[in-house]
Amino acid sequence: MRIIQILPELDIGGVERHVIDLSNELTERGHDVMVISNGGQMQNQLSGKVLHRDLPVHKKNPITAWRCSVKISSWIRQEGWELIHAHSRVPAWIAWCTSSKTKIPWIYTAHACYSLNYGLIPLKHAGFVISVSETVQDHIKDCLPVNFTVIPVALPESTVRWDSTYRSKNRFIFVGRLTKIKGLDTVIEALGKLKNENWTLDVLGDGPEKEELEKRADVLGLSDKITFHGYSEEADSLMSRSSCLLFPSHCEGYGLVPARAAQIGLPVIASNIPTVLKMAGSNKYLVDPGDVQGWQSAIFDFISTGRAVEMPVLNIHSFERMVDSNESVYTDLLCD
């Protein structure tokens, strides 16, 4: 099959990670894959077998989107691409428009609980809609076409395992985009109440809230305890040499970071949100998002006793199964 993947950018995030891993594996299985995005820091992680083309598919401008559609349509006609897989809302509009011009099918993967507004209008016109969790599917249920399913995202198996000798070192780690929805501000406030305890926090990620979070850590006198590393391609290695992952998100479509912690074996203190609860199997050691007092208590309990969630790997979707499921959707659409 000749498959086009469209996403806004290849900067830091779970959508980007998913598209990169899926595209790389599809080419290993003999398919031709073209990724269209505005580029970004993670672009170099695409396999040499994956074709990448830059277009401003991240811009929420109807004229720009139409021009992108015209360009993609010309590539489809000249090069024989067979199917479009869109990720995020602007790419969905572009895919719908392009499909109308070229008569090739398109599908959409919903990665998060987006606002229920005009941005989701194209979904009713998709050949298939994939949601990354039951939570996301339930959220967009009124926007779905006839054909839809849940395919949880997954990561290739990690090459590292957690070194349990780090449990007692109280070396916490946060991995994720620095936006309000990720909840790092709650953790920083909680840690501010524990600044006399023996701990450190490594923050891996970048985003619009970085400067504000750094300032707040400084105001609370935590600059010597919290290190903001920015984006790092060594997340797995650093997680394997940490004591515990802190995952304070307010909402997640799936939650690749705690899933990765499960693969590595790293203990987790996480928010009590539906996607995490399903992974963990119970709400023991889960904390309400935004609850500073609750996070303070959970972190102090870990420092004192080492207690945290150890995510069962059996609850984590396998990467091979995820790719198989996507491949099956592609095949079914092309055979119709």
Regions found by a protein language model. Give the residues of each.
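Conserved acidic donor-binding segment of nucleotide-sugar-dependent glycosyltransferases
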Residues: 285-293, 300-306
